[in-house]
Design a protein with these regions (language model features):
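Cleavable N-terminal signal peptides
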Residues: 15-16, 26
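Sec/Tat signal peptide C-region and signal peptidase I cleavage site
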Residues: 22-28
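Short beta-strands within extracellular/lumenal beta-sheet-rich domains
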Residues: 98-116
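Bacterial N-terminal signal peptides that target proteins for export
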Residues: 2-15
């Protein structure tokens, strides 16, 4: 199935089709660790049992973050809140989170580190009282060196066809709605790869109403130290 045909499906259909079709191409050694805090365990420190707490001095903090596809909700923060090291103090704090426009099916966000770096971990964090807590996205990466590389794939372009590699898919909906969701993407061999760019293909968690877009509080990228 091509990306263009997926794009013609409904938002929920797109999410399911993309996850099912592309999951098979994810690297066999990739590990996706999912954790969730609810009740009193959900604090502004975002401390999880199995996922590292957010960091302030990570590679993402210095990256250029660009919204490629979709629109951010005007009630929330822009893409800069994903890497500013500042966390919401409570659930449902719109301006402290990035999320796509109400009723939309998601979109794409790119990180550019300026040069190739060795990436060890990609960690993402979200917090909401309902369907805006789970995380659903596809993570791609590229060093930008492949012939025909497209740094800005639009909604009808499959990143795999223009120099991007699918790293993995993330779907934390089985953990339940509400609370804090933490995700840590690692590799069994220690390094996810040497890349200049990361591309996040975010998908709405549900389409039963207009409130299915995740409140992303922070995304960290941990690189190998020189």
């Amino acid at each position: 199935m091509t990306f263009s045909s997926i794009a013609r499906l409904t938002n929920l259909g797109w999410a399911l089709a993309a996850l099912l079709v592309l999951a098979a191409s994810a690297h066999a050694q990739i590990r996706v660790t999912v954790d969730r805090n609810i009740g009193s365990a959900a604090t502004k420190e975002f401390k999880f049992k199995n996922v590292p707490a957010p960091a302030k001095e990570d590679a993402a903090a210095k990256a250029t973050v660009t919204l490629l596809v979709g629109e951010n909700d005007p009630a929330g923060g822009d893409v800069s809140v994903l890497t500013d090291g500042l966390l919401p103090a409570k659930a449902d704090e719109p301006k402290s989170n990035f999320y796509f426009a109400s009723g939309s099916g998601g979109g794409r966000v790119r990180m550019d580190f300026g040069s190739v770096v060795e990436i060890k971990q990609v960690n993402s964090y979200s917090w909401h009282t309902g369907a805006g807590a789970p995380q659903v996205y596809l993570l791609y990466a590229s060093d930008g060196a492949e012939i025909g590389f497209n740094a800005e794939p639009n909604a009808n372009t499959d990143p795999i066809d223009c120099g991007w590699k699918l790293i993995t898919t993330v779907d934390t909906r089985k953990s339940g709605d509400g609370g804090q969701h933490g995700v840590s993407i690692t590799d069994a061999h220690g390094i996810l790869g040497k890349y200049r760019y990361l591309l996040f293909g975010f998908v709405a968690t549900e389409t039963d109403d207009d409130a299915g877009n995740t409140f992303y509080s922070e995304i960290d990228v941990v690189t190998k130290k020189p």
